[in-house]
């Protein structure tokens, strides 16, 4: 495993150097930005992404090439990067990815449950397939990944789990009932894990961004026959005069929450909403 001190990684002030992060939904968007931000702090990365199209919601996902270029960019920072093409709903694939990460990198210090989807539809008109896909990817997926990582964190008596929820995990949203249900569920799971895992020195925090300028936002716009800006403004309505935040804004929060600077933050909701929830 490369020594971060010998690579091109700049000096870290976060206490993260040498740690290992496992990130889902890592090929693009918030996951990719977070992987790169952590790598700049000297963190080794295990990147998981489905890396193929999904029947629902129907917009483009990350690709195997995205994973490859992420690995190249992370390694260029002087740290290791493992990549896994795996669906968070596939327990066998996730179990294998976690086992390989432990074997190759020795531990998992940080879990960023970021993989997720979004789609529109009135709740009473959704198909069962749409409902199940949303809940299984956005809520069951983090649970599947978490239950494979948590025993290792318990054994090492430390760890940080960051679950990427949404402002929709703190309020209701029209035509996003299944999405909101999945994100509220993730908020509840985060709080419950925080209670259960605190005795083992493990912190758990949920993140709640407003709309983010990612390929998912572009895909939703295409499905709706609208521009990304129209979708962002329709879905969000931020207090600050911006249609969205950037993936790097979420990545900055991930670095902070994973670091020693946040050592007493657990069981809470970290809101990055450009003031939306204040309206």
PLM-predicted stretches and their roles:
Residues 146, 182, 190:
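Active-site helix of classical SDR
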Residues 14-46, 50:
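Canonical Rossmann dinucleotide-binding motif of NAD(H)/NADP(H)-dependent dehydrogenases/reductases
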Residues 2-12, 171, 254-255, 266-279:
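Short C-terminal tail/terminal secondary-structure segment
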Residues 122-123, 130-135, 234-235:
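Substrate-binding pocket helix/loop in short-chain dehydrogenase/reductase
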Residues 198, 203, 265-267:
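Short, small/polar-rich loop/turn modules that mediate ligand/substrate recognition or access, typified
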Residues 166:
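Residue(s) in the substrate-gating loop at a strand-loop-helix junction
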Residues 238-250, 261:
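A conserved structural motif in NAD(P)-dependent oxidoreductases
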